[in-house]
């Protein structure tokens, strides 16, 4: 019978990989998890959690505007709207990162408490029972691939050089004055709401006639109207044909205006 370093090696310490590894260890297996970043995965580090934190923060600008109609204001404000307010983007990102550190630490503790070894580095499968991390090779009876997904750039000239993905959008050190978002799926729509809420001039460019393709038609129409009412500039029936800088994009119509 073959001898291995571990019963199970999991590549990826996201929600799925951590859970599977803990369950296996709980049944007596010797388990290692290989992770090139830190425990948490897409949801905790680059997806649901940081995005929802920014989304929640962006909603307060609308609350301030609504408050004016209910008599709230500052007699000493310089703003014509009656309320003087500002936003510390750097402070928001710092606090967001602190929360991600806390949650990643919880994932690390879950692995430690289950007796799962965490191996830092990028795992490369070298055989049916072997994975290389750096210069060292590890063996296991079973290898579980739980690496999740990763955003990609469309094959459009200049986009990869001058654009950013959702990963980088969550790590910006400053709030852009203006931003163009290509696509109108739920992730793009969420980011449009985030940057618009924080005061960025926001463009949403998409090929379809309405955002959120595949969703209920009435919902899509209502969403488009609500986004425009909030000041988001919609570009339906368009695609990006090239990018020359972060602030200069070329677009053209993909169908005639009727």
What is the meaning of each model-derived region?
Residues 3-6, 22-29, 34-175, 208-212, ...:
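Glycine-rich flavin
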Residues 4-13, 177-182:
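Beta1/beta-strand and adjacent pyrophosphate-binding region of the FAD-binding site
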Residues 8-32, 192-196:
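N-terminal Rossmann-like FAD-binding beta1-loop-alpha1 element of flavoenzymes
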Residues 12-17, 148, 183-188, 253:
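Conserved phosphate-binding and hydrolysis motifs of nucleotide-dependent enzymes
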Residues 174-207, 214:
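Rossmann-like NAD(P)H-binding beta-loop-alpha module
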Residues 247-256:
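Conserved small/polar residues in nucleotide/adenosyl-binding loops
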């Amino acid at each position: 019978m073959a001898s291995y370093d571990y019963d199970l090696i999991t590549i990826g310490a996201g929600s799925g990989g951590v859970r599977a590894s803990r369950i296996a260890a709980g049944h007596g297996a010797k388990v290692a998890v290989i992770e090139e970043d830190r425990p948490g995965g897409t949801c905790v580090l680059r997806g649901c959690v940081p995005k929802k934190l920014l989304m929640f923060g962006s909603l307060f600008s609308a609350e301030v505007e609504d408050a004016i109609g209910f008599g709230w204001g500052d007699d000493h404000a310089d703003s014509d709207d009656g309320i003087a307010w500002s936003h510390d983007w750097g402070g928001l990102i710092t606090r967001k990162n602190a929360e991600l550190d806390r949650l990643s630490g919880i994932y690390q503790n879950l692995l430690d408490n289950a007796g799962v070894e965490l191996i830092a580095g990028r795992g490369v499968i070298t055989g049916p029972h072997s994975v290389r991390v750096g210069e060292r090779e590890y063996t296991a009876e079973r290898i579980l691939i739980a690496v999740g997904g990763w955003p990609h750039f469309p094959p459009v000239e200049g986009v990869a050089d001058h654009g950013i993905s959702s990963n980088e959008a969550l790590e910006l050190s400053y709030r852009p004055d203006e931003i163009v978002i290509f696509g109108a799926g739920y992730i793009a729509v969420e980011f449009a709401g985030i940057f618009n809420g924080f005061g960025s001039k926001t463009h949403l460019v998409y090929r379809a006639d309405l955002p959120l393709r595949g969703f209920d038609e009435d919902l899509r129409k209502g969403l488009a109207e609500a986004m425009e009412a909030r000041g988001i500039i919609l570009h339906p029936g368009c695609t990006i044909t090239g990018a020359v800088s972060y602030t200069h994009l070329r677009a053209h119509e993909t169908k005639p205006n009727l």
